[in-house]
Amino acid sequence: MKRALISVSNKEGLLDFARGLEKLGYEIISTGGTYNTIKEAGIKVKKVADITGFPEILDGRVKTLHPKIHGGILARRIPEHLQQLQENDIGPIDIVAVNLYPFRETISRPGVSLEEAIENIDIGGPAMVRAAAKNYQDVAVVVKPEFYQALLEALEKPGGISPEFRLKLALEAFSHTAAYDAMISSYLSRVSNSDLNQNLILAGEKVYDLRYGENPHQKASFYRFMTPGLGLPDARQLNGKELSYNNIIDTQAAWELVREFDEPACVIIKHTNPCGTAVAATLEEAFDRAFAADPLSAFGGIIALNRPVDGATAQKAAEPFMEVIIAPAYTPEALESLQAKKNLRVLELPLEVAGGLQIRTVAGGFVVQESDRDKLDMDKVQVVTQKEPTVEQLKELAFARKVVKHIKSNAIVVARDGMTLGVGAGQMNRVGSARIALESAGEKARGAVMASDAFFPFKDTVELAAQYGITAIIQPGGSVRDQESIDECDKHGIAMVFTGIRHFKH
């Protein structure tokens, strides 16, 4: 008689699967809660303990770790193995259907203790899954309910399960256990404050396949990390088509920046750089000012807002062509306006998004760093010029600095009254970025402030800023020629402060 071992924490589809196996003549073996569920449904089932002759012990920690289980799973259907099974009174097991203790759900609960988490680390389950996957040519292993029906259909065919489907199931199984172990490793790293271990293991779960990547000829998919933490994959999409690869990257950039501000704020992003950023007394005004900062570049951009969106703001945001709008919430009036634009992707995501590591691949590996979440205390900046910035200028410098840290280096921001006037991004020399930002601001630069993501290697950036009427500058400092820039500021009556903190972004 063919035998199937079933032990699942996720009972979805379990009874239909068990009935299907029973109909096909399989003897079903099971454990604990799975056994009870199957038996109560009137389906014939045997306890693992009845097969092993050994009871579950240690509060259920040891159930299936027994030669009569693992021998039955690992035995090849070759004479030598079958003879050894017979000599040891072990029956072959042909199907293993196992999914693991809900570790992710456990560690996602607020206030969960380390002890609770440890008790939800599955041992016997992964051992059976790996054993069955290793012996995939003779044992079918299924770890997800969505494969139950396909497996039943394959079993009903004259030739049984194809080698290709067996291999696919084995791949799913090994991926399942690898992701499970990675999740445990990540959790223990977090609770022990050891984020950058000697071995860094990442586990992701596919959200969906993307139409294409950065360009149409590139394949792409969207994954979420399997460890708990709210992020972009958790955003509720309330309108529009699925996000594209570029939408996802740009939306993340917009969301990171808009979360910098305590007051109502709006950010408009193109190609991960902000073309307009503004704060104001109301969200509607913040949108108006952010859009006015660079309406030409805003076309086809990403809007991020850090307050629930009201009807008036939504009505204005729906007028120009935009790809995505993301905010913590929307009023019914706001949704009515936004959903009238069928192609506008409307996302809802709480501001309390988890931080994390930044990971970038290189040939043969990847580099990892902490996210740049520095919160500068403006009371601790160093005034290095004869002229001190006013209280109002310090406020403007703080705003400009929050923006500049989110721009591709070399980065320069010109701002005034809580609004960007010009942005210079990604130039190979700093004065080049300054020229772009200042030319974009034009006459509006007179009386404005400037922020730089890194020090000025020469005084030329200050010279250019003076020509446009910049009154105050914030930068990290640290150049061997800092004094030349300081002297140039003093020459033109510009106030300058050093933060001591660089914000390169590549």
Swiss-Prot record:
PROSITE patterns: MGS (PS51855). It catalyses: (6R)-10-formyltetrahydrofolate + 5-amino-1-(5-phospho-beta-D-ribosyl)imidazole-4-carboxamide = 5-formamido-1-(5-phospho-D-ribosyl)imidazole-4-carboxamide + (6S)-5,6,7,8-tetrahydrofolate; IMP + H2O = 5-formamido-1-(5-phospho-D-ribosyl)imidazole-4-carboxamide. The keyword Transcription does not apply. Pathway: Purine metabolism; IMP biosynthesis via de novo pathway; 5-formamido-1-(5-phospho-D-ribosyl)imidazole-4-carboxamide from 5-amino-1-(5-phospho-D-ribosyl)imidazole-4-carboxamide (10-formyl THF route): step 1/1; Purine metabolism; IMP biosynthesis via de novo pathway; IMP from 5-formamido-1-(5-phospho-D-ribosyl)imidazole-4-carboxamide: step 1/1. The keyword Transferase applies. GO terms for biological process: 'de novo' IMP biosynthetic process. GO terms for molecular function: IMP cyclohydrolase activity; phosphoribosylaminoimidazolecarboxamide formyltransferase activity. GO terms for cellular component: cytosol. Keywords: Hydrolase, Multifunctional enzyme, Purine biosynthesis, Transferase. Its EC number is 2.1.2.3, 3.5.4.10. Residues 1-143 form the MGS-like domain. NCBIfam families: PRK00881.1 (NF002049), purH (TIGR00355). Belongs to the PurH family. The IMP cyclohydrolase activity resides in the N-terminal region. PANTHER family: BIFUNCTIONAL PURINE BIOSYNTHESIS PROTEIN ATIC (PTHR11692:SF0), BIFUNCTIONAL PURINE BIOSYNTHESIS PROTEIN PURH (PTHR11692). This is Bifunctional purine biosynthesis protein PurH. The lineage of its organism: Bacteria, Bacillati, Bacillota, Clostridia, Eubacteriales. The gene is purH.
